[in-house]
């Protein structure tokens, strides 16, 4: 067994023993030592959220890939969860084909920036055919094209203290992911689906594609990305609007 795997096994075993023998406080301290505390670590299910997140990060490579499919496997139907944003701003942008839309990127970056849709399309892109699994029980396979989030973040200069990327859409929803997922090669800012412009119901003009996590983490209608060292001062401090509604912050599949 390699030194890395021995260390991972030791930490995972210690977390489990701490959870069983001494409860939440000891397990939380141990996970915190290795930077493995998720934002939703408090409350009745906090220890479970912490152990799930910590075990995944310890035992799996940050670059393990979600399965990619062939074009022949693309689903004929791609269901949609939720409605279009009803705000005047979104409706105006939609009717102008997002000509005046911009994605702002700020926070713990060296060069805060903003990008038009056309500017994003001129950046290096990635196309992948992956599964979108919704928390409502359905799924579909689609082809997605967009800018790798890791490329965009590196282009603006991530500062060393950065821990999370917060994603704000053109509606009241928001989500956050850790740097491991933000820098993963399959994490995209997608502007196209199945070879066409991203349809509005699927998140136009830009959505997150995070194929290693469940559907609600794949934020649609993006307008703002903020790099932070903590999410405690955003919303209720638990890492996302879905978490505030009772979902897990880490939703790996």
Predicted regions and their residues:
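Structured, non-membrane catalytic/scaffold regions adjacent to prosthetic-group chemistry
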Residues: 28-253
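Generic low-polarity alpha-helical segments
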Residues: 10-11, 23, 111
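N-terminal secretory signal peptides and thylakoid transit peptides that target proteins
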Residues: 1-18
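A general, composition-driven signal for non-globular sequence regions
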Residues: 1-2, 23, 51
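Hydrophobic alpha-helical membrane-insertion segments, chiefly the h-region
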Residues: 20-29
């Amino acid at each position: 067994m390699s030194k890395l795997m021995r260390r991972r096994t030791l930490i995972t075993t210690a977390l489990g023993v701490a959870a069983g023998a001494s409860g939440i406080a000891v397990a939380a301290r141990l996970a915190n030592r290795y930077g493995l505390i998720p934002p939703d670590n408090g409350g009745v299910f906090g220890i479970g959220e912490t152990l799930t997140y910590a075990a995944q990060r310890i035992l799996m490579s940050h670059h393990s890939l979600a399965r990619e499919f062939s074009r022949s496997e693309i689903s004929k139907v791609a269901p949609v969860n939720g409605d279009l944003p009803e705000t005047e701003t979104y409706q105006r942008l939609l009717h102008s084909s997002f000509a005046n839309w911009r994605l702002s990127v700020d926070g713990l970056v060296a060069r805060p920036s903003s990008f038009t849709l056309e500017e994003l399309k001129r950046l290096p892109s990635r196309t992948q055919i992956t599964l979108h699994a919704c928390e409502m029980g359905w799924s579909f396979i689609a082809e997605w094209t967009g800018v790798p989030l890791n490329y965009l973040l590196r282009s603006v200069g991530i500062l060393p203290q950065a821990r999370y990327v917060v994603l704000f859409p053109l509606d009241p929803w928001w989500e956050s992911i850790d740097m491991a997922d933000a820098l993963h090669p399959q994490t995209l800012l997608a502007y196209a689906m199945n070879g066409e412009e991203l349809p509005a119901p699927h998140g136009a003009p830009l959505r997150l594609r995070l194929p290693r996590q469940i559907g609600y983490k794949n934020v649609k209608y993006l307008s703002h990305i903020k790099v932070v060292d903590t999410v405690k001062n955003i919303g209720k401090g638990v890492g996302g609007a879905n978490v505030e509604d009772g979902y897990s912050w880490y939703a790996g599949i």
